[in-house]
């Protein structure tokens, strides 16, 4: 795995092996090195910059929510991100009616599941199963979320309609992701 010329481990990055265009790494996969284990910390400590160089580490915190805020033009989410708010606590406050100052970690975790679940298309059944609640309660949470951020529902509906008409969707960078299972036209 160590290159004999450079003395370094080199990975191969590709954007063409995943349907979504998400960056993938192999030979070896350097994107999924554990951080919470002793072995993971030891592996990570081997990454050092050449003299006079620096390593850049980027944490795309809540990137999916930031992207949906942008592409769907969700003012409430954009404002929350601009103010540096904890978006999961803000969602919990709105969906569950709990003041942010009194946020229980379990309620925040449930809001996190709602935030990510909805943008990935979770159903009331799926959310109920994930949170251990009734399907009726899950539907109420989803409806409350969509009432708070109606732009997300419109964006999702428009995207589904586009996919039905064209057989693909476009990423924010113009990449076509072909979708099977829809009648084109």
Protein language model regions, located:
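Catalytic nucleotidyl-transfer cores of nucleotide-processing enzymes
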Residues: 1-90, 94-109, 125
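Conserved catalytic core of nucleic-acid polymerases
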Residues: 10-11, 15-18, 93-185
